[in-house]
């Protein structure tokens, strides 16, 4: 209906089809392989862009189509339209913790999941969908109660942000000292990547990062910081810890960058090592002492 209406309004509108997986040449298929139609649009003075439901559009391409192959009929011929992947900076998944810690080691606050680019496809279909399924697809730190019932979803211009309250033990107190554990939430599907045999490719390169801000009780100071790692060639993994004594908060972060969507044997080894470092983050502790 929209296709015909746009054509009547002097737009050039073409219907393409998104398959569940790329199709080999001259291989028969059935109607079940097609996920949905996509419109390719252009008009005088308007650059060509794609319309895929209500998904956010970045540089003329909905995030859902990054790296995909679309198909259409041109007479008796099947034509392919390969959608650019974009840069790894276009596909960013940020998990951010904001935590207040008391002298008993109990913490409370919010954790937010910020999905940009191709990561938006993790979101369930439909505005009123229950996001419990998405949150259940993460490995959460033990000892924390994640309040899924009060999760809030924000629809941004080119992203989604989910904010979830939480509470639980984040530190071990003992006689004026405290051992703070840095919480980390990890998508289960990301960990399964280590089981793939190279070579293989993703739909797009990406960034996964985790950030935390921990506000400590008055009078506490850092005793020492754990060793910080960083480096890589095709897969970069870097960490950061900064203590602000005046404001009593600790900032922590790690960032995993996959620079190319194509993974060969060397990149696979780097990625496997980076994923291990990412999992280790949930075991990192920082000691504090009361002055």
Where are these regions (language model features)?
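A sensor for short, sequence-defined functional sites
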Residues: 1-291
